[in-house]
């Protein structure tokens, strides 16, 4: 049975943790979905982990719709959330509703996510009014990387911490069904999670959130050159891939692959007629 926004709320009410991961294509979505995950975020992080951009700012609506369609086709259980890219909702309330609608109508997503606190409250209200579920996102919001001066922990001083608490309450009032808390102190995320009735989903926000999300390439150690402090490695798929590719190259070079069992047969009398 497909997880819904109601499922997320029920899990919070029962005190059961919500599980989410990112996915960006059909095959990975199918694997993650079959593992029993509650939700999949098609994150604009695809700009960095799939497209090789320095940050998420270059990701377009067409990029997001393309990948969201693939993820939806690979799922039957998880709630699929489409991440609204930079400048798809900041320009006007009309644009916010229109682009959110494209995620639902064209890509088949079940909800959308957008970054920001009080500054996007009106956009969230309008999207929800259009019957589209919205997941909020506060703390370190990657689309604001230039304003933050880099990817830095947020909420370590009283002023910013109080602002994040207030933002969470405003997003709940605006109609968000859940809020991602990214890179904020663990004890602050506890206060926020206890201050609102909707679920909080943490990434680098400690254990007190109502759920957790990670970028799957990070938690499966696909890349060895960088791992955020908040990521735990739950596998070493990157090394396995490199080992497998290296072995493939070796066996092809040495004419050990393909073997006879990998080849298709043809009758000898047919072959003899070809010479």
Swiss-Prot record:
- The keyword Metal-binding appears for this protein: yes
Which pathway does the record list?
Answer: Cofactor biosynthesis; (R)-pantothenate biosynthesis; (R)-pantoate from 3-methyl-2-oxobutanoate: step 1/2
Amino-acid positions noted as binding 3-methyl-2-oxobutanoate in the UniProt annotation, renumbered to this chain: 44-45, 83, 113
Pfam families named among the record's database cross-references: Pantoate_transf
Q: Which GO terms describe its cellular component?
A: cytoplasm
Residues annotated for Mg(2+) binding in this entry = 44, 83, 115
Under Gene Ontology molecular function, one entry of this record is: 3-methyl-2-oxobutanoate hydroxymethyltransferase activity
Where in the cell?
Cytoplasm
Give the EC class as a word. Answer: transferase
Question: Required cofactors, per record?
Answer: Mg(2+)
Q: What is its EC number?
A: 2.1.2.11
- Quickly give the catalysed reaction: 3-methyl-2-oxobutanoate + (6R)-5,10-methylene-5,6,7,8-tetrahydrofolate + H2O = 2-dehydropantoate + (6S)-5,6,7,8-tetrahydrofolate
Give the co-factor note. Binds 1 Mg(2+) ion per subunit.
Q: Which GO terms describe its biological process?
A: pantothenate biosynthetic process
Give the main location. Answer: cytoplasm
Residues annotated as coiled-coil are none
Going by the UniProt record, its keywords in alphabetical order are: Cytoplasm, Magnesium, Metal-binding, Pantothenate biosynthesis, Transferase
Q: What is said about its interaction partners and assembly? A: Homodecamer; pentamer of dimers.
HAMAP family per record: PanB
Identify its protein family.
Belongs to the PanB family.
Q: Tell me the function of this protein.
A: Catalyzes the reversible reaction in which hydroxymethyl group from 5,10-methylenetetrahydrofolate is transferred onto alpha-ketoisovalerate to form ketopantoate.
Tell me the protein's name.
3-methyl-2-oxobutanoate hydroxymethyltransferase
Q: Which organism is it from?
A: Clostridium botulinum (strain Loch Maree / Type A3)
Give the gene symbol.
Answer: panB
